[in-house]
C-alpha cells in the first residue's frame, strides 16, 4: 500500500532540532482506513488507534508513560468543538498526515487528481473492496486521461472482458446474455458498479434509449439494424425507424464489424438469428430486390433470402445469370457466406450452365466429327464441369442441411438435370452420332483424331529419345473435363508446365480395352474368352502389364498408386532405379462409380482423384526427381444425377443373335448380330471378327446389377475423349522456368485524404488470374502510424480472369472506428495477404473529420 511507504518516509526523515521522536496524527474522518489500520506496520513506529473511549489512556501514554518511541496516531473521529479533542495540545507540536482512499487510488492507477475523476471514483467504493477486481482493473493498463475510460474499464472487469473500449464492453454485455434480469454482467454492475453509467455509455455509443422495460434483446436489435442502415436504404427498412439511430450508424457498424471478425462471431450469429426471428426480418427481406440486399451483412437471413429468390426463379425457368454472378462475387467476402457457400456455389454453376446454353442455343452444328471432337476439347467439355461442380456443391450442402433451403435446392437440381441431360447430352450426343454414324460402321478408330491405341508410340517414345525416364499416371475413368481442371491446377500450383491434349479411346470405352491400348504393342487382340492381349500377352492386372512394359525395357515398372505411397523414399527409388518407363495405376473415380451404393459419390471421387494425383506428382518430382510425367486414363464416363426414364433405356430384346458381352453402354456380339437403334462398330483393330454396338446419345442398356447412373463403354464424347496431360517439372535454373505468383492488388483511387467516417476506395487487379498468375485474397484496413487499426477490415479476392483491365476493378467501402483523428498525423492504408502479417502495399493517408471520442462522462 502506497500510504505505508509514504508514512515510512515521513518517519525516517531527520527530526527537527531538539526533537527526540516523531508523532504523526493521521486524520481519517471518513474512516476509509479503519479496517486496514491494524495491518499497517512501520519499523520503529508504534500505532495508536483512537476509539473515542480511550482519550485519557492516549493522553497519558503520549505525554507520561512513553515519551521515547515514535507514534502513528490514527484518528477517525470528527470533533464538533475543538475543546472535545483531548490530544489537541499534543497535536500542536506533532505532525499531521492525511490520506483519503480516493487520492491513494488515483496515485495507484496514475489517475489525474481532479474533481471529475474523484467524482467518478466515489461511485465504485464497493468495486475496490475486492483485491481481485482491483487487480483486474490494474491489468488493463489504461491511461486515465478521462473519467470515461474508468467507467468503461469498470464495466469491462465486471463483464469479464479485456476489451476495454466502448464497443468492447457493449459486446461483452450482450455476450453475457440477452435476458437482462439473468445477465451475470448486469448483476455484477448492479452490485459493484453503476447501472446508470452503463446505460449512459450504451446510449452515447449506440443511441439506444433506456426506457421502462428496455432489454438487451432490444439493444441487440437496435445495434444490428442501425449497423445495417449503413448498407441498406431507408425505404428498405421502413417501419423499423424506432430501432435505428442514424447519427450512431457508423459506430454501430464498426461495433458489429469488429465483432464479426472476433473470436465470438458464432455468438453474434446466434444473437442475429434471435433478432431476425423476433422481428420477422426474413419475411421483410423476401419482398426487397436482391440488388438492395447485396451489401447487407449483419443478418444471416439475408443470404437465405437472396438464395431463395434465385432458386425460386430458377424453378420457374427464370435464370438471371449476371445477377447470380454479381451476388456470388459480392457475398463471398462477407461474414456469414461460408455457412451457405455451397448454395452460392451451386447457383454459380447454374448461371454458368445457363450462359453456356444461351451461347449455344442453336445447337452444336459442326459439320465434321474431328472439328466437333476439337470443339468439345476446347469448350463444350465445360458444361460437364459445371454439372459436376453443381452436384458437388449440392452434395456438400446436404451434409450441412438447411431445412429452409434444401427443398428449393433439389428443385433447382431438377432444372439442372433437364438442362444437362435433355438439352446438352442429347443435343451434343445427337450431333456426334450424326457425324460419326457412318464412320464408326467402317472403323472404330475415327480418322483425323489421335488414337489411344498409339499412345505409347506418340507420347512416350519421343520423350525416351532424350534418355530420360518417363512416368505415366493412368487414372481409371479420369474423364477429360476432370483432367482439364487438374491441368489448370498443376500450372497454377507447381513449378512445372502442363499441357492438355486428347485422344479417342478404344471401343468399348472400358477398362480392359483402354488399359491394353496404353501399353506398348504391335497388335492388340481380343481372344475367344474376350481377354485383351498385347502381342499375345495378357494385360489383365498390374503384374501382367509390367511384363508387357518389360518387353521394351527390362527395368520398366508397373505399380499401383497405393503401393507406391506405402513405400518409404528409399524403397521408391530402388523400385524405379533401372526403369525408363514407370506406369502408375490410380483408381479412385471408377472404384466409386462402378458400385451401385456409391455411384452417387462419383463427383466427390473426382475431387479426391485430383488431390491424389497432385500429391502423386509431388512424390515423383520430389522423392524420385522425376521430370517428365504423362497423366491419362483408360476411358471417361457418363453420369446423370436423376434415375433415367424408361425412354432412355434399351432392352436386350432389341438385339438379335449371340451376345458375348453386354454392359450398360455397349454390346459385343457375333458379326451376324443386329441391334435396333444402335451404332454397329467393327472391332477388327483387335484382330477379331466380333462386332460391337453402342446405344445412341445418353441411352443405357438394361441389365441386372452394377451402376446405372454412372456408365462408360460407349462412344459419347464424355466416354471416349481421353485426356493426356504432359507435365514437365522445371527447375528454377531452366531458361523456360516461370515461377508461380499471386495476382497483385493496387490502389486505384487518386485521393489520399479521408473526410468521412464511411468512405470508399477503388482497387485494381494488375493481371488476370490465369496460368502462373494465381488468385489471391487480401485484407485491407486503415491504421495509424503504430499499425493499430482505425477502420474495419475489408476483404478482396483477386481472382478475376478478364483480359479487360476495367473488368478487374473493385469498389470497396470502409468505416472508421470510434477515435480521435488528427489531420496533422499520418495514417496508412494496408493491403495484407489474408491470414498473414505480410503487408504487400502501404499507402499514406490523412484523415480530416470532426470525429472525437466523446465518452467522457
Describe the residue ranges of each PLM region.
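Beta1/beta-strand and adjacent pyrophosphate-binding region of the FAD-binding site
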Residues: 473
Amino acid at each position: 500500500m502506497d500510504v505505508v511507504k509514504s508514512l515510512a518516509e515521513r518517519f525516517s526523515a531527520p527530526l527537527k532540532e531538539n526533537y527526540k521522536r516523531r508523532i504523526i496524527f493521521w486524520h481519517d474522518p471518513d474512516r476509509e482506513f479503519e479496517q486496514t489500520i491494524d495491518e499497517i506496520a512501520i519499523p520503529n513506529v508504534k500505532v495508536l488507534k483512537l476509539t473515542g473511549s480511550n482519550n485519557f489512556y492516549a493522553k497519558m501514554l503520549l505525554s507520561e508513560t512513553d515519551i521515547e518511541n515514535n507514534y502513528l496516531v490514527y484518528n477517525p473521529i470528527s470533533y464538533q468543538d475543538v475543546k472535545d479533542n483531548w490530544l489537541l495540545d499534543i497535536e500542536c507540536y506533532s505532525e499531521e498526515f492525511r490520506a483519503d482512499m480516493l487520492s491513494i487510488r488515483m496515485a495507484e492507477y496514475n489517475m489525474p487528481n481532479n474533481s471529475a475523476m474523484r467524482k467518478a471514483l466515489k461511485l465504485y467504493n464497493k468495486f475496490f473492496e475486492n483485491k481481485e477486481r482491483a487487480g483486474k482493473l490494474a491489468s488493463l493498463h489504461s491511461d486515465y486521461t478521462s473519467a470515461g475510460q474508468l467507467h468503461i474499464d469498470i464495466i469491462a472487469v465486471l463483464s469479464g472482458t479485456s476489451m476495454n473500449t466502448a464497443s468492447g464492453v457493449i459486446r461483452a454485455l450482450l455476450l453475457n446474455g440477452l435476458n437482462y434480469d439473468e445477465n451475470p454482467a448486469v448483476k455484477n454492475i448492479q452490485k459493484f458498479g453503476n447501472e446508470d453509467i452503463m446505460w449512459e455509455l450504451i446510449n452515447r455509443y449506440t443511441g439506444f434509449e433506456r426506457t421502462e422495460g428496455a432489454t438487451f434483446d432490444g439493444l441487440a436489435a437496435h445495434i444490428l439494424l442501425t449497423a445495417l442502415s449503413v448498407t441498406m436504404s431507408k425505404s428498405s427498412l421502413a417501419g423499423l425507424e424506432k430501432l435505428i439511430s442514424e447519427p450512431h450508424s457508423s459506430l454501430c457498424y464498426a461495433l458489429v464489424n469488429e465483432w464479426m471478425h472476433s473470436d465470438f462471431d458464432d455468438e453474434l450469429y446466434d444473437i442475429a438469428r434471435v433478432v431476425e426471428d423476433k422481428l420477422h426480418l426474413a419475411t421483410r427481406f423476401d419482398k426487397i430486390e436482391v440488388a438492395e440486399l447485396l451489401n447487407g451483412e449483419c443478418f444471416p437471413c439475408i443470404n437465405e433470402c437472396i438464395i431463395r429468390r434465385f432458386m425460386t426463379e430458377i424453378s420457374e425457368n427464370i435464370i438471371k445469370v449476371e445477377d447470380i454472378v454479381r451476388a456470388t462475387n459480392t457475398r463471398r467476402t462477407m461474414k456469414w457466406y461460408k455457412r451457405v457457400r455451397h448454395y452460392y456455389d451451386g447457383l454459380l454453376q447454374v448461371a454458368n450452365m445457363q450462359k453456356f446454353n444461351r451461347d449455344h442455343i442453336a445447337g452444336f452444328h459442326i459439320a465434321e466429327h474431328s472439328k466437333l471432337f476439337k470443339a468439345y476439347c476446347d469448350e463444350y467439355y465445360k458444361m460437364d464441369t459445371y454439372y459436376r461442380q453443381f452436384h458437388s456443391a449440392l452434395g456438400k450442402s446436404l451434409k450441412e442441411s438447411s431445412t429452409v433451403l434444401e427443398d428449393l435446392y433439389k428443385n433447382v437440381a431438377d432444372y439442372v438435370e433437364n438442362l444437362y441431360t435433355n438439352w446438352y447430352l442429347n443435343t451434343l450426343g445427337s450431333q456426334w452420332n450424326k457425324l460419326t454414324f457412318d464412320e464408326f460402321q467402317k472403323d472404330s478408330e475415327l480418322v483425323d483424331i489421335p488414337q489411344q491405341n498409339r499412345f505409347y508410340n506418340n507420347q512416350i517414345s519421343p520423350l525416351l529419345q532424350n534418355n530420360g525416364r518417363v512416368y505415366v499416371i493412368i487414372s481409371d475413368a479420369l474423364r477429360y473435363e476432370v483432367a482439364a481442371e487438374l491441368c489448370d491446377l498443376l500450372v497454377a500450383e507447381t513449378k512445372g508446365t502442363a499441357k492438355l491434349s486428347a485422344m479417342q479411346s478404344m471401343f468399348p470405352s472400358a477398362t480392359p480395352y483402354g488399359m491394353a491400348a496404353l501399353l506398348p504393342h504391335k497388335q492388340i487382340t481380343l481372344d475367344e474368352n474376350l481377354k485383351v492381349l498385347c502381342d499375345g500377352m495378357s494385360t489383365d492386372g498390374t503384374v501382367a502389364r509390367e511384363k508387357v512394359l518389360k518387353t521394351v525395357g527390362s527395368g520398366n515398372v508397373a505399380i499401383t498408386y497405393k503401393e507406391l505411397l506405402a513405400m518409404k523414399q528409399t524403397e521408391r527409388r530402388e523400385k524405379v532405379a533401372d526403369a525408363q518407363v514407370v506406369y502408375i495405376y490410380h483408381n479412385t473415380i471408377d472404384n466409386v462409380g462402378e458400385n451401385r451404393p456409391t455411384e452417387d459419390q462419383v463427383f466427390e471421387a473426382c475431387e479426391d482423384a485430383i488431390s491424389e494425383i497432385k500429391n502423386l506428382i509431388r512424390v515423383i518430382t520430389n522423392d524420385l526427381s522425376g521430370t517428365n510425367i504423362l497423366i491419362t486414363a483408360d476411358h471417361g464416363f457418363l453420369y446423370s444425377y436423376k434415375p433415367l426414364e424408361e425412354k432412355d433405356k434399351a432392352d436386350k430384346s432389341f438385339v438379335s443373335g449371340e451376345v458375348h458381352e453386354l454392359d450398360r453402354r455397349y454390346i459385343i456380339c457375333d458379326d451376324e448380330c443386329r441391334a435396333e437403334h444402335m451404332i454397329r462398330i467393327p472391332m477388327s483393330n483387335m484382330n477379331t471378327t466380333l462386332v460391337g454396338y453402342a446405344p445412341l446419345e445418353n441411352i443405357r442398356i438394361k441389365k441386372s446389377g452394377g451402376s446405372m447412373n454412372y456408365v462408360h463403354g460407349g462412344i459419347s464424347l464424355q466416354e471416349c475423349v481421353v485426356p493426356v496431360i504432359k507435365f514437365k517439372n522445371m527447375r528454377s535454373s531452366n531458361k523456360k522456368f516461370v515461377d508461380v505468383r499471386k495476382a497483385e492488388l493496387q490502389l486505384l483511387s487518386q485521393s489520399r485524404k479521408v473526410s468521412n467516417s464511411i468512405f470508399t476506395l477503388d482497387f485494381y487487379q494488375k493481371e488476370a488470374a490465369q496460368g502462373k498468375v494465381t488468385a489471391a485474397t487480401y485484407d485491407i484496413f486503415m491504421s495509424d502510424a503504430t499499425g493499430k487499426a482505425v477502420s474495419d477490415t475489408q476483404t478482396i479476392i483477386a481472382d478475376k480472369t478478364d483480359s479487360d483491365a476495367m473488368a478487374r476493378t473493385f469498389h470497396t467501402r470502409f468505416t472508421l472506428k470510434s477515435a480521435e483523428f488528427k489531420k496533422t498525423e499520418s495514417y496508412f492504408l494496408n493491403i495484407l495477404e489474408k491470414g498473414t502479417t505480410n503487408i504487400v502495399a502501404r499507402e499514406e493517408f490523412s484523415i480530416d473529420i470532426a470525429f472525437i471520442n466523446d465518452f467522457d462522462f
